[in-house]
Amino acid sequence: DRLRSRGLGDVYKRQPIDQPSLWLSNGSIRFRKAFNDTIYDIKGHEATVHTTFHTGQWHFPSEKMGQKEDTDNYIVITGILETPKHLFFISLQGLYDKRKPFYGIYDKEKHITYINDANVGLTDDLTHFMPFYPITCTEEGEYAALLEIGKIDEWMDKNPGIVQEGKLSFLQEINEESNPVCVIVEP
């Protein structure tokens, strides 16, 4: 099984979901074992719990891993991006058959989690540019994605008035030989 790192809309097709995650956040090394709902801080030879995703009744029991029957309602966390204020995560319900991807943002300060259908993507409420799916984040709290010109053209055909003026007017100059567009946003 694979998780697409380029877009949540096709969330499970490219990157293996059974791989552990290791990243640096605020000078701390974080680790999450595949199919596990806990993020650990690594210091020296010790691992301490940093964050646990409380999936409640949707928690995927370890004894059911590999079983296709009666597992469609369980949720598995498949990817995480961490900024100083947020945890952006991808979860998958129905790991083996009826797959339904979600993305979530956990606000570390307010202790609130926001969940949405991953097929919707994130939308820039300032420019109303096309929905996108973050592939990386910065220590400053920004999320970034690369958008292919073909996808932008498709979106512009369906939304012609949005790029006429303002911050998106540069999109009128792109063509099929243009470089991908890097989108950087801050929640």
Where are these regions (language model features)?
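Short beta-strand elements that form the blades of beta-propeller/WD-repeat-like
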Residues: 23-33, 37-40, 75-97, 133-154, ...
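Short loop/turn segments that connect beta-strands within beta-propeller blades
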Residues: 42-46, 107-110
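Blade-level signature of beta-propeller repeat domains, shared across WD40, Kelch, NHL, RCC1
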Residues: 139-187
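C-terminal structural cap/anchor segments
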Residues: 78-127
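Single conserved hydrophobic/aromatic residue that forms the stacking wall/gate
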Residues: 1-12
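Beta-propeller blade signature
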Residues: 37, 101-112, 178-186
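Short coil-to-beta transitions that initiate beta-strands within beta-rich domains
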Residues: 13-24, 68-72
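Conserved blade-ending motifs and adjacent loop-strand segments that build the rim/top face
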Residues: 50-72, 109-140, 153
